[in-house]
């Protein structure tokens, strides 16, 4: 929905073109940051970021904004995870969704 795009960027690659890049998690990691690129969202609206449907952050996005999101707890578990970027009418999360885009990344244990 909408023209906004979210891209996950890891040392392994990006989520561009449906790719699923890996994030390697060391055994005792409590928090891991992942880089995001947000583009083509309406800049007068806030963009809400969710990881696995859990609210993580919100940003005012210009034409292209690079930021990070913190992975913690279940987000660090091995497997695929989804980042969702959403904009709502009147910046109200209970309101109508006007932009919605997702990207997937995979967490793997670091050797």
Predicted regions and their residues:
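Local beta-strand/beta-hairpin segments that build beta-sheet-rich folds
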Residues: 55-58, 72, 98
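Beta-strand-rich extracellular modules
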Residues: 84-90
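Surface-exposed, short loops/turns at beta-strand junctions within beta-sandwich domains
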Residues: 72-80
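Short strand-turn-strand beta-turns centered on an Asx-Gly dipeptide
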Residues: 50-54
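Short beta-strand segments within Ig-like beta-sandwich modules, predominantly Fibronectin type-III
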Residues: 57-65
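Primarily secretory-pathway and cell-envelope proteins
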Residues: 1-46, 93-111
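Short strand-edge motifs at loop-to-beta-strand transitions and within beta-strands
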Residues: 65-69, 101-103
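Aromatic/pi-system hotspot detector in well-structured domains
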Residues: 46-48, 88
